[in-house]
């Protein structure tokens, strides 16, 4: 049975097969975990992201989708970049956005599985500058990881 472990720390120091990056749609780096992954991983990650933008993602990566690059100098094989939604505040729209957040986790975990990753480090997607409450983002991540693990073919 797969193991889920909560780690509070620097995701760039994790020794895993895949690190999920809470990216922005431009894929060109930014603040928070996105900037930390680009800095720690080195210029090859940005070069691959630029290539993706020039070839297959000219309009950027849509919310809830995921794409993989190499991991550069990180202790991983891949970086799985995903874009989460911006927190709209409590209310009906939050429920719809929560589905987008689930989608970001689901597509990231699915892509990591297709790549052959046996271990994946997930950040609290959307919890930084996108304003999502960290405890809710973590709960969505955990629930989605458990659902994904239980789904056939994952």
Which stretches of residues belong to each language-model region?
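Glycine-/small-residue-enriched capping loops at alpha/beta junctions
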Residues: 1-98, 102-114
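Phosphate/ribose-phosphate-bearing ligand recognition and processing surfaces
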Residues: 86-154
């Amino acid at each position: 049975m797969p193991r889920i472990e909560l780690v509070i720390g620097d995701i760039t120091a994790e020794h895993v097969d895949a690190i999920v990056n809470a990216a922005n749609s431009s894929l060109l780096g930014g603040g928070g975990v996105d900037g930390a992954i680009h800095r720690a991983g080195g210029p090859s990650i940005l070069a691959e992201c630029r290539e993706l933008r020039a070839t297959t993602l000219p309009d950027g990566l849509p919310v809830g989708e995921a794409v993989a690059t190499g991991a550069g100098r990180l202790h991983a094989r891949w970086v799985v970049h995903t874009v989460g939604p911006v927190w709209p505040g409590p209310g009906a729209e939050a429920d719809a956005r929560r589905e987008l957040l689930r989608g970001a986790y689901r597509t990231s975990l699915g892509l990591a599985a297709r790549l052959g990753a046996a271990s994946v480090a997930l950040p609290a997607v959307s919890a930084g500058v996108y304003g999502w409450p960290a405890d809710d983002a973590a709960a969505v991540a955990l629930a989605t990881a458990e659902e994904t693990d239980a789904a056939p073919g994952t």
